[in-house]
């Protein structure tokens, strides 16, 4: 079976800007690390293992919704749609939707977007494209912003109906203010054009605010190597910038995984889960490559947040984003739901 096509839509190379983002985050207060640092190929392998653990309810619930409601969700997608999947690291979940579209003989174009070229190739290789006649597949190598620009500006794409998939609770990784801005940006790029009345966003949100359930989900097996792998990746990126002939001993980079541990916390005031790295033994000097930044013992270097949305917060998110809620798909006892959103 021939390899599915991959289109490079990158406006710039993320790897080139990540070292600057690392330094900027570590010199800020509170200290942070950029989320993209955690999604190297090795990081994604650890995350995929972690997300399959029994206590990690978000993935399990989302799969149940797509498995049971796939036909109804597929019916909400217009014929001839361009489906842009902004979270395509694993197709197991969305596969139920694609199979439903095929069963309905609905001709659509599915584009899996990923920042990692190797991960994208792996994802596309797993698609049994020979089983599909009505759903056609391709990959997009780039960032969220690259994907939105592409769907808005590509002549043969921009006037077709669009369906943007934002599953995997991705919107929860943004602050509430930034989530509204990002969702509005998606709407402005993908829900406009000649077929805007037929275009939509399919968004998953988590409403669970039970601290024990949430923290148990984000401390299940696989999350620690996922978190610590980012330090190895950061060091590799920084060392790659060293010019030949420069003594590497002069330019030190102290990002040893064994010197750090992972912290999982529930923030009651903000209604979010917080994931951080903390020095294990004492103060850590990060070395000359990182401007000799000192991370104090017990000081948190935050790298991820997962916001949970109750009904009032969800309504405000949609209002601030300029979108209207249409259909909602969930199951009894589920904290996760998938929302159909249209331009207001």
From Swiss-Prot:
Keywords: Alkaloid metabolism, Methyltransferase, S-adenosyl-L-methionine, Transferase. The keyword Methyltransferase applies. Homodimer. GO terms for molecular function: methyltransferase activity. Its EC number is 2.1.1.261. It is an enzyme of class 2 (transferase). It comes from the Eukaryota. This is 4-dimethylallyltryptophan N-methyltransferase easF. Gene3D superfamilies: Vaccinia Virus protein VP39.
């Amino acid at each position: 079976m021939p390899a599915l096509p991959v289109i490079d839509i990158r406006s710039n190379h993320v790897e080139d800007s990540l070292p600057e983002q690392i330094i900027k985050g570590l010199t800020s207060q509170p200290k942070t690390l950029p989320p993209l640092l955690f999604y190297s190929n090795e990081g994604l392998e650890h995350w995929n293992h972690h997300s399959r653990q029994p206590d990690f309810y978000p993935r399990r619930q989302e799969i149940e919704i797509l498995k049971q409601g796939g036909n109804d969700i597929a019916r909400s997608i217009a014929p001839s749609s361009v489906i842009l999947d902004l979270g395509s690291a694993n197709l197991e979940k969305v596969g139920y939707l694609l199979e439903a579209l095929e069963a309905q003989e609905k001709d659509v174009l599915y584009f899996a977007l990923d920042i990692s070229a190797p991960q994208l190739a792996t994802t596309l290789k797993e698609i049994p494209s020979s089983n599909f006649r009505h759903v056609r597949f391709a990959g997009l190598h780039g960032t969220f912003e690259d994907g939105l620009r592409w769907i808005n500006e590509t002549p043969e794409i921009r006037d077709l109906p669009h369906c943007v998939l934002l599953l995997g609770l991705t919107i929860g990784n943004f602050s509430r203010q930034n989530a509204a801005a990002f969702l509005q940006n998606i709407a402005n790029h993908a829900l406009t054009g000649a077929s805007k009345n037929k275009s939509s966003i399919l968004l998953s949100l988590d409403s669970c605010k039970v601290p024990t359930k949430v923290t148990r989900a984000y401390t299940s097996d696989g999350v620690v190597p996922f978190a610590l792998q980012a330090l190895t990746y950061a060091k590799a990126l920084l060392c790659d910038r060293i010019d030949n002939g420069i003594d590497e001993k002069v330019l030190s980079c102290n990002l040893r995984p064994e010197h750090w541990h992972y912290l999982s916390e529930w923030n009651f005031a903000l209604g979010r889960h917080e994931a951080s790295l903390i020095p294990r033994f004492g103060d850590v000097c990060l070395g000359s490559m990182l401007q000799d930044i000192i991370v104090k013992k017990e000081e948190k270097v935050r790298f991820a947040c997962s916001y949970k949305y109750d009904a009032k917060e969800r309504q405000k998110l949609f209002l601030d984003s300029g979108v209207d809620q249409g259909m909602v798909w969930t199951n009894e006892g589920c904290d996760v739901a998938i929302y159909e959103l249209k331009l207001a």
